[in-house]
Swiss-Prot record:
InterPro entries: Spider_toxin_CSTX_knottin (IPR019553), Spider_toxin_CSTX_Knottin_CS (IPR011142). Belongs to the neurotoxin 19 (CSTX) family. 01 subfamily. It comes from the Eukaryota. It comes from Lycosa singoriensis. Disulfide bonds join 48-63, 55-72, 62-87, 74-85. The presence of a 'disulfide through disulfide knot' structurally defines this protein as a knottin. This is U3-lycotoxin-Ls1q. The lineage of its organism: Eukaryota, Metazoa, Ecdysozoa, Arthropoda, Chelicerata. The keyword RNA-binding does not apply. It is found in: Secreted.
Amino acid sequence: MKFVLLFGVLLVTLFSYSSAEMFDDFDQADEDELLSLIEKEEARAKECTPRFYDCSHDRHSCCRSELFKDVCTCFYPEGGDNEVCTCQQPKHLKYMEKAAGKAKKFGGKVKKWFG
């Protein structure tokens, strides 16, 4: 009976050790993948097109604002036949950013009151 109990404890210990090693390997792979994605995003962010600049060469190159990415909007100017594309922020996203900023500011005040 003691042998079975000792063997069971040894088996559980080895199983937990092997699964912990496996999870560490997965965590390391996830971290490496995340770091490479962050590096790619930073490299791409340096090449973005600022707001109200021409984005007709690459419609997905608009810069990010505080919360949202600007959108390449194309239109025909009055009296013109050429299409013009510029990076712009849609109004609903502009209002959402303002509301988030005010909520953040109010949250800071509440934290001061009760913190």
